[in-house]
UniProtKB/Swiss-Prot annotation:
Interacts with CDC48A. The gene is PUX11. This is Plant UBX domain-containing protein 11. Residues 174-190, 201-214, 441-478, 486-496 have a biased composition (Polar residues). SMART domains: UBX. Residues 312-390 form the UBX domain. It comes from the Eukaryota. It comes from Arabidopsis thaliana. Residues 160-316, 441-531 are annotated as: Disordered.
Length: 531
């Protein structure tokens, strides 16, 4: 355990994850228990120098005890069936390798190196092809190589084909019987041997290559650099149309395709002869990327259909019509329908007995008149969902009480209308009995311009009006009925001790004007009497 503790990361799980991402290393999780195989791993495998060297170069190791909270959380994301369990997680969070049970030190070191190299080759190839495809203005012609669909959670084939000594595992986590391809090597005679192995355990994601020596790290890195420099030339060659003068390429492509299909179905070992032209995983990636573009076209067509549905919906207008009693009518009309159709719908569906009315928009307030009935809803700017209110038309009302006296005076003497209005304004400053309307129609003296201060001539006219207003044709009842108009005129004179039982111009009724001067109240009813 002392050797294992020296290899593990000193820190929390989040810190270990950030460390692995920052240094581009594999995040390796070792879950152990109290069983015999876990103890054997601790004594024999983790103490080996090759394992320690591989971990220091390629991995960040975290040790978790089985049954702990961290082990439960890990199993929820990356399920495992037994302990001890060793799992390698890539940069993007995908599980690239896992083994359960005892494993030798040589196999563990080789598997970790191959997983790290395959992950880096995949990342380098993907970045180069992404840059190459982004620079293309036109769509790249699709080669005759068929696209190979990889199961979820597996390593792409470019990690196995691009590197001669790289082993890749292809196995879905859900199937009972899976096939893993391992130890894909290129012999001197140009033969590609693809060895398939059928595993009885669904959790075994790695086929250890015991017979194959572990490749050197320096040689593999040089191979990666060579593949990176060779990639732009391949991209340019793939842009050119395929000519029938290279039958070896087509034969090789069909052979690889048939071998992959047969390997999945039967799990048998197939040895095929290569004509000297190898098909790398980059061809498969290119085909997959082009297929992705083609699969996106139906989505665009679906988007156009959705736009057509939206435009179809925009051609309908949903109206919510509010009636005066608080009820509502809801109906859908076309934008080409005229407003008269809406009004006919209201007439046929209302039950409150509406009279003459108009339709209006509540905000901003706009009332549609009879001239708008022949206009379409689109011309009236009614789209989508709109609210309308029913506005009843107001009936004209005649108030006879307020107009009977003045109209009779105007009809009696049409020339006295302006004079009466002017005198009435002047009397509002000095006369508390300004409700006498046209009582000055028989006055013959002309009135000068408006005066802001009362004068003796106006006061004399007041006395004459008070004594001469006895014409039975105009009626005394109208004089008494117009008493409330005094407050409506707004005079600034306050009367004192007014009694309606007395004569309107009786003696002893004193009043004040706006200049604190008291008039009236004398024995003879003289309005010129000042106090």
């Amino acid at each position: 355990m002392e050797a294992l503790s020296s290899l593990t990361f000193k820190g929390s799980l989040p810190e270990a994850i950030f460390e692995a991402k920052g240094k581009k290393k594999l995040f390796v999780v070792y879950i152990s228990g109290e069983d015999e195989e876990s103890d054997k791993l601790n004594r024999l495998t983790w103490t080996d120098a090759s394992v320690a060297d591989s971990l220091s170069k390629y991995c960040i190791l975290v040790h978790i005890q089985a049954g702990s909270v961290d082990a439960t959380n890990f199993s929820a994301i990356y399920p495992y069936s037994s302990v001890p369990c060793i799992a390698a997680i890539g940069f993007s969070g995908t599980q690239v390798w896992r083994t359960e049970g005892f494993i030798t030190a040589e196999d563990l070191a080789s598997s970790l190196e191959k997983a790290w190299l395959g992950l880096h080759i995949q990342e380098t190839t993907a970045s180069i092809f992404s840059a190459a495809l982004a620079s293309q203005n036109s769509e790249t012609p699709v080669s005759s190589a068929s696209s190979v669909v990889l199961p979820p959670g597996s390593v792409p084939l470019d990690a196995a084909v691009a590197s001669p000594s790289t082993a890749s595992s292809v196995q879905p986590s859900e199937t009972k019987s899976t096939v893993t391809s391992a130890s894909t090597t290129e012999n001197n005679d140009g033969t590609v041997a693809v060895k398939g192995k059928e595993s009885a355990e669904p959790s075994n994601l790695c086929d250890t290559t015991k017979n194959q020596p572990a490749p050197s790290v320096d040689g593999t890195k040089a191979n990666v650099e060579h593949e990176a420099t060779e990639t732009p030339l391949r991209v340019q060659a793939e842009k050119e149309p395929i000519r029938p003068t290279a039958p070896g390429t087509n034969d090789n492509t069909s052979r690889v395709r048939s071998s992959v299909d047969r390997k999945r179905k039967q799990g048998t070992v197939i040895n095929e002869e290569d004509s000297g032209v190898g098909v790398s995983g980059r061809d498969i990636n290119l085909t997959k990327s082009v297929d992705t573009k083609e699969t996106m076209k139906p989505k665009d067509e679906g988007g156009e259909e959705e736009d057509g549905e939206k435009s179809k919906k925009a051609s309908d207008v949903h109206l919510n019509i509010r009636l005066p009693d608080g009820s509502s009518l809801q109906e859908k009309f076309s934008v080409t329908s005229i407003l008269r159709m809406v009004k006919d719908y209201v007439n046929s569906n209302q039950t409150i007995g509406l009279g003459a009315y108009d339709l209006a928009v509540p905000y901003p307030r706009k009332v549609y008149t009879d001239q708008d009935l022949d206009k379409s809803l689109s011309e009236l700017r009614l789209f989508d969902r709109q609210a309308l209110v029913v506005v009843p038309r107001k009936r004209a009302t005649v108030y006879q009480r307020g107009t009977s006296y003045s109209e009779s005076n105007n009809n009696t003497d049409p020339n006295s209308g302006g004079y009466f209005a002017y005198v009435r304004r002047v009397l509002s400053y000095a006369n508390p009995f300004s409700y006498f309307g046209g009582g000055t129609a028989n006055a013959s003296s002309s009135v000068p311009e408006r005066q802001t201060r009362p004068n003796t001539e106006v006061r004399n006219n007041l006395g004459q009006v008070g004594t001469s207003f006895q014409d039975p044709s105009e009626g005394r009842s109208n004089v008494r009925n117009r008493r409330p108009t005094t407050s409506r005129i707004g005079s600034n004179i306050h009367t004192l001790n007014h009694n309606e039982d007395e004569a309107p111009f009786g003696d002893g009724n004193a009043f004040w004007n706006g200049n604190s001067t008291q008039y009236g109240g004398g024995s003879g009813g003289d309005s010129n009497d000042r106090r």
